[in-house]
Design a protein with these regions (language model features):
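Short alpha-helical segment immediately N-terminal to, or the first helix within
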Residues: 133, 199, 396-397
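Accessory DNA-binding and partner-docking regions appended to nucleic-acid-acting proteins
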Residues: 188-190, 208, 217-444
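Helicase motor core with emphasis on the C-terminal RecA-like subdomain
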Residues: 1-184, 188-191, 215-220, 226-227
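Alpha-helical scaffold segments in soluble metabolic enzymes
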Residues: 14, 49-52, 195, 209, ...
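Short, solvent-exposed alpha-helical surface patches in well-structured domains
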Residues: 14, 49, 74, 100, ...
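Short polybasic/polar patches that bind polyanions
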Residues: 17, 80, 145, 201, ...
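Short, charged low-complexity linear segments at domain edges
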Residues: 184-214
Length: 444
């Protein structure tokens, strides 16, 4: 018998392979923890949000997970300075100190622990009322495992997640420094990290998204996550979903998201022609929609559980059983209109005389950050910086400060090819700059 607490399809397959199991019987319990309310927020002013959260729950036991050991210590110190009793825990503490902190938490002498992710794995404390992620976890599996340490008594509990692109950058740097990690393993980690970041920014019900990730169908909205309590505008996206699923089916599910979008939009890129995808019936069936719209909708189909990523097969998209119900049985699909509502004309670019000194300073600071990002990418790829983006394009980014995919694609010099290759890196850099997230992510 092989047992595991949390495993997606790929992990289950790998377990069977490693243990040399031949056609094993697999029993999967539900991943649903209905007593845990899932809330996700951007990382701006997270310390103030956490102090407010704790003051509204005096005496309740909870864990605050941090990426860095230093952050654990500093966050606990700042909370204590605000009159909120907290301790910190990480691997650098002496064994006797770790044991003391664990006992203080178990016996309710300290209600809040600021810790790295190892804390809680061997602790049987049923009345943990909340888990806060000060930094975003590196995958949805990790997220699910860590929030599962609250509400074990079945009573209401809350999981509060803060996210930022600074977390993504920190994990990427950490993965790159790992010694002996095969390239394919590193690529898988990065893909799962990006999936986690996509989850944090998704307009789809949190519970539905998490359960879909593990292959479990949840045909309703939970009614208590941050998305359900403040829902976006929805529209009937059944035909859009059917076009995407049909096109994927006709490629024999041998493409990733970007290539699928280009097929739907009737692109004449070389690999489409060479592989004969221009001959399939759904080639160009979605040419009336932009690349950005299709990118947003495919992400939603993924979080709705209609698509999945075959991590072990070149990260190609696959249609799930629920996806086939949409394709062949006409099961309706409601999509969030988040991108459509964001597609408003960008603010008129001010002439230099109209800008304040502060605005000019900020735009220049952003321009220099974008130039530094461009230089880093150019060095990695061994190409001149202008091949990435011209200075004029970076200047327009700094002036207009686009915050959505749709806005970014309206910047002169950001075509679909450039977007596909470099766009998200620059968009996330701009988002981080505008939110003032750098300082927030550096410490508590």
């Amino acid at each position: 018998v092989a047992l595991t607490a949390t495993a997606d399809r790929l992990t289950r397959k790998d377990i069977a392979l490693q243990l040399r199991l031949c056609d094993p019987a697999v029993f999967i319990a539900s991943f649903d923890r209905p007593n845990i309310r899932l809330v996700v927020r951007p990382g701006q002013k997270r310390f103030e949000q956490i102090t407010d959260f704790l003051r509204r729950r005096p005496g309740q036991a909870g864990i605050i997970y941090c990426l860095a050991r230093r952050t654990c210590e500093e966050l606990a110190q700042r909370l204590n300075a605000r009159g909120l009793r907290a301790a910190f825990y990480h691997a650098d503490l002496p064994p006797e100190e770790r044991s003391r902190v664990q006992d203080d938490f178990l016996y309710d002498r300290v209600p809040v622990i600021c810790a790295t992710v190892a804390f809680g794995m061997g602790i049987n404390k049923s009345n943990v009322r909340f888990v806060i992620h000060y930094n975003m976890p590196q995958s949805i599996e990790n997220y699910y495992q860590e929030i599962g340490r609250c509400g074990r008594d079945g009573l209401p509990a809350e999981a509060l997640l803060f996210y930022s692109y600074g977390d993504v950058k920190a994990y990427r740097e950490m993965f790159q420094k790992e010694e002996g990690c095969p390239p394919e393993r590193a690529a898988l980690k990065i893909t799962k990290l990006e999936r986690m970041y996509s989850f944090a920014r998704s307009p789809v019900c949190r519970r539905k998204t998490v359960l879909a990730y593990f292959g479990e169908t949840y045909d309703r909205r939970c009614g208590q996550c941050d998305i359900c309590l403040n829902p976006p505008e929805y529209f009937d996206g059944t035909v859009i979903a059917q076009k995407a699923l049909s096109a994927l089916k006709r490629t024999q599910e041998r493409v990733g998201a970007n290539l699928l979008i280009d097929i739907l939009r009737g692109s004449s890129r070389r690999d489409i022609m060479e592989r004969g995808f221009h001959r399939i019936k759904t080639y160009g069936a979605g040419r009336e929609y932009s690349f950005a719209e299709w990118s947003d909708w495919l992400s939603q189909l993924l979080h709705l559980g209609l698509l999945e990523i075959a991590y072990d097969e070149h990260h190609h998209l696959r249609i799930t059983p629920e996806g086939y119900k949409v394709l062949f049985e006409g099961k309706p699909v409601m999509l969030a209109a988040s991108l459509r509502s964001a597609e408003k004309p960008l603010a008129r670019k001010k002439m230099p005389a109209e800008r304040t000194a502060g605005e000019l300073d900020r735009r220049e600071a952003l321009f220099q950050r974008l130039r530094e990002l461009r230089r880093t990418i150019a060095v990695q790829e061994g190409v001149p910086p202008y091949v990435i983006f011209h200075d004029s394009t970076l200047q327009e980014m700094a002036d207009r400060q686009p915050l959505s995919v749709a806005d970014m694609l309206r910047i002169s010099g950001v075509g679909e090819r450039k977007w596909e290759r470099y766009g998200m890196l620059f968009l996330l850099e701009i988002q981080q700059f505008v939110s003032g997230d750098s300082a927030e992510n550096a410490g508590p």
